[in-house]
């Protein structure tokens, strides 16, 4: 993996980022190192402001957005929270361009949860799965569709509205993942 991919994939870059980051870390160190009990209120308040900013960007309802250490950890928590048997005998649909660790997770959990993993292939020479190809594979047998809203590797953005409508038509559970800071 090249350094440019790592930087592009993992973190946003902008002018004066180092200065802004140094200031934020200095403020955190000052608060966290004070000899009082205000550290957790500060840290949790900062976290909530971060969540509220993302919620506003996403135009999401109050208390509907949270943070997680990783996309894969969040997706695992979602899978583990499903009612027992929800996926048994059904399919989980993912694109070949989904976050690789989520694909590995699903491969490993298929037997335990009793589902078949269906991976929508890339077209010859394509860097991302086309929306219509994903929709063509979405049948009533799909119990969960993992939608990658914005790909971390190609920046391709799916037509989320079309995907939601399909999920509603089949009464399937859809998980929207956006590993570029939105997931």
Can you say where each PLM-predicted feature lies in the sequence?
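Pyridoxal 5′-phosphate
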Residues: 1-183
């Amino acid at each position: 993996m090249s350094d440019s991919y790592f930087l592009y994939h993992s973190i946003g870059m902008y002018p004066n980022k180092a200065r802004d980051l140094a200031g934020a870390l200095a403020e955190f160190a000052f608060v966290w190192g004070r000899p009082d009990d205000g550290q957790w209120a500060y840290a949790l308040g900062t976290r909530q402001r971060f969540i509220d900013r993302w919620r506003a960007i996403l135009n999401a309802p109050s208390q509907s957005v949270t943070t997680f250490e990783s996309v894969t950890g969040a997706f695992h928590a979602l899978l583990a929270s499903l009612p027992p048997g929800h996926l048994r005998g059904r399919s989980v649909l993912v694109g070949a361009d989904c976050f690789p660790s989520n694909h590995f997770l699903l491969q490993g959990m298929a037997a335990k949860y009793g589902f078949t993993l269906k991976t929508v292939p890339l077209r010859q020479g394509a860097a991302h799965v086309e929306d219509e190809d994903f929709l063509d594979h979405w049948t009533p047998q799909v119990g969960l569709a993992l939608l990658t809203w914005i790909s971390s590797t190609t920046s391709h953005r799916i037509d989320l509205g079309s995907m939601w409508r399909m999920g509603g038509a089949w009464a399937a559970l859809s998980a929207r993942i956006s590993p570029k800071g939105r997931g």
